[in-house]
Amino acid sequence: MNDYCINKYYINNYHIKKAFNKRALMQDLIKKAGQVKLLVMDVDGILSNGQIIYDANGIETKAFSVQDGVGVKSLARYGILTAIITGRSSPMVDKRAAEMGVNHIVQGRDDKLIALNELLATLDPALNITAADCAYMGDDLPDIKAMQTVGFAATVPNAHAEVIKRSHMVTTRAGGTGAVREICDLILKGHGHYQDFIASYTLDEAKTQDNLSWILVF
């Protein structure tokens, strides 16, 4: 009985510490996200699932997440810039970027770090955006140098192991399935805009609580 109590205590203590550490880590990530002025995204493996599909005519197609699009637009709503830096070139990327309202698009660049530095050099100096003010989402080796330079580096669970090792955060969702949205939400939280953004899509919950309670009881 005593052994059981001791073991139970240690098990509970372990879970408490684990929960505390997880919360502390999340608070640190939110703090980092709160410094972000520009979100830079790779395309293949981040905005898409990394697969390249060719039709019978050899035309390349990609699939993108609608939820990611909402996330990118949410950043623009609060004055946070977005950019795409990708090694491949595709008219579909231009089209999707335009739909999402991405501010800067750089395609066909293998050296992502040079591309990032060149992009930063073109920004209005009044914005005062440096690499330390950027978040970068990448998933493979060409992204690492740029990710090591920025203030907040994020990747996806199926990224290359070397990328994961050098990332501040690994999203729950894979590329092309809402991973970018996770980072966008985190950036909104860091800047204190998340609740305001959610409130713009919801009714006054105090007025709808009675109906919700009735549904749950029923």
Feature names for model-found ranges:
Residues 8-13, 18-19, 50, 74, ...:
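A ubiquitous, low-specificity "background" feature that marks scattered single residues
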Residues 20-114:
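Alpha-helical substrate-recognition element adjacent to the catalytic core
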Residues 58-62, 98-100, 104-109, 113-218:
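Mg2+-dependent phosphoryl-transfer enzymes with acidic/Ser/Thr/Gly-rich catalytic loops
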